[in-house]
């Protein structure tokens, strides 16, 4: 499992436990500032999948 998949799974789990999309956007922003773009890709994919 690569970094993107790992963060995708973690993000989906957070949403299922009651986290909001907005909380994931905050997390996305944090990883973007850290320039961890693989993590960003996973979080963004989870947001996109759950927003539809």
Where do the model's predicted regions map?
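Long, non-catalytic architectural segments outside compact domain cores
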Residues: 1-23, 52
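Alpha-helical solenoid scaffolds that mediate protein-protein interactions
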Residues: 27, 47-48
């Amino acid at each position: 499992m690569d970094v993107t998949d790992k963060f995708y799974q973690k993000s989906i789990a957070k949403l299922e436990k009651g986290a909001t999309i907005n909380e994931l956007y905050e997390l996305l922003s944090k990883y973007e500032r850290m320039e961890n773009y693989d993590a960003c890709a996973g979080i963004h994919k989870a947001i996109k999948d759950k927003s539809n």
